[in-house]
Amino acid sequence: MRFGSFFLFPDRRGEGIPDMYYKIGERLEEIKPKNFENLKYQYVAVISSEEWIKNNKKFSMGIEWDINLDEITDTHVEVNIDSLTGTFSIPSRKNTSGPRHNFAFALDEKGIVFVDDEGFAGRLIDKLVKSKRYLNPCLERFLYDFLEGIIHRDYKIIEQYDAKLDQIEKDVLDDDSTGSIRELTDIRSELRDLRIHYAQLMDLSQELEENENSFFKEDNERYFHLVFQRVQSLHEMTSSLADYTSHIRDLNQAQIDMKQNKIMTILTVVTSVFMPLTLITGWYGMNFVHMPELSQPLAYPIVIAVCILIAVACLVFFKVKKWL
């Protein structure tokens, strides 16, 4: 299931992405520093994996980190002695089961470096450059806005999933669920992907909030807690919708069982009605010579009347028992 109008950015895989450097001030101000060791301000950098391999030492983070963006499978953060390193694997909101937006990052108290060959991180930061102004500029607030930018449209997307599931449930109740159950399976799979994504973001925000390396000011740790709360809310909403899909599947199965029960009831009634008639037919089909009633002129209509009476009696009995 796709919600194209809520896809964050155009996909530019394979395009050459320029390296970008920003100073965290009242706004994110693009800069071209040569020495990151003696900066008097915190910074944000977005570079390619090739640039990281060639010049990672200029960021003075004290790490030897070989990252292969093609091997990224999840979102997580690792605590090192002099830095934090991690990866992002973000499902596309246009098609959650399709290719993901994968990039890596490394940060210390001086700033953060995103390693991104696709350009997703750069485009998100470009939106922040155009829309954000900071009263108290700091790395923590930038990280809050960056993480919030990843999820800020997700509430609307989840509302659309909810509305679609409501429609599928209505179709099931109206006995018009052709094609809907297959779509329900797709939605369930997409919700599972989102739920896993949110769980990983929750772990990442908690790790940042713990501030094991004391890179962040204690007063600013609240930004990561705010991110955690927002992502937790989304995680709970997707879990609730996943349960809703299970409810709809059970409801659809119940509808199928009801149809089958009705068919079996009809077959049982037909069998029960015709069983005594079959017995009578078989009785008189034995062709014994000495069957005195066969010589009576009223025998034939009497047998017909008896058969009709038996059939009516059976139908009345089933009706009284509410089997019909």
Q: How would you describe each model-predicted region?
A:
Residues 81, 176, 220, 260, ...:
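Solvent-exposed, flexible loop/coil residues
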Residues 270, 274-324:
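Alpha-helical transmembrane anchor segments
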Residues 2-133, 200, 204-216, 321-322:
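Helix-boundary and N-terminal cytosolic regulatory elements
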